[in-house]
Amino acid sequence: MKNVLIHKGATYKTRSNRRRKVRTPSGKLVNRRVKKHSKKHRCHECNAILGSIARMRPAEFSRQKVSARRVNRPYGATTCGRCVREKIISAFLGNEERIVMEKTGAAAGG
């Protein structure tokens, strides 16, 4: 392919200013700006991929509606469902254990 002029923006070859040559339907060659790709969101606990959260750069991500940014549950934007389930169960069991200890301590003391 032949060289194509860059008409808009900076001409520097940097990571944030990448361009790709594209042939338009009319047969003209133009330079299109290529966006930087974003990484997939991951669970903060087990590092599993959070599949249902939109994958895009932070500025674009902040403009998305809430349903695209997180899942509708506690810790939906940062933690996977498995880790949330484990958190809830461990908190519940810890609470139950504390109540049992209080009851047995009161029965032994009183």
Swiss-Prot record:
Coiled coil: none annotated. Keywords: Ribonucleoprotein, Ribosomal protein. The keyword Ribonucleoprotein applies. GO terms for biological process: translation. Residues 1-41 are annotated as: Disordered. It holds the Pfam family Ribosomal_L34e. InterPro entries: Ribosomal_eL34, Ribosomal_eL34_C_sf, Ribosomal_eL34_CS. GO terms for cellular component: ribonucleoprotein complex; ribosome. The keyword Iron-sulfur does not apply. GO terms for molecular function: structural constituent of ribosome. Residues 30-41 have a biased composition (Basic residues). Disulfide bonds: none annotated. PANTHER family: 60S RIBOSOMAL PROTEIN L34 (PTHR10759). Belongs to the eukaryotic ribosomal protein eL34 family. This is Large ribosomal subunit protein eL34. It comes from Encephalitozoon cuniculi (strain GB-M1) (Microsporidian parasite). The gene is RPL34.
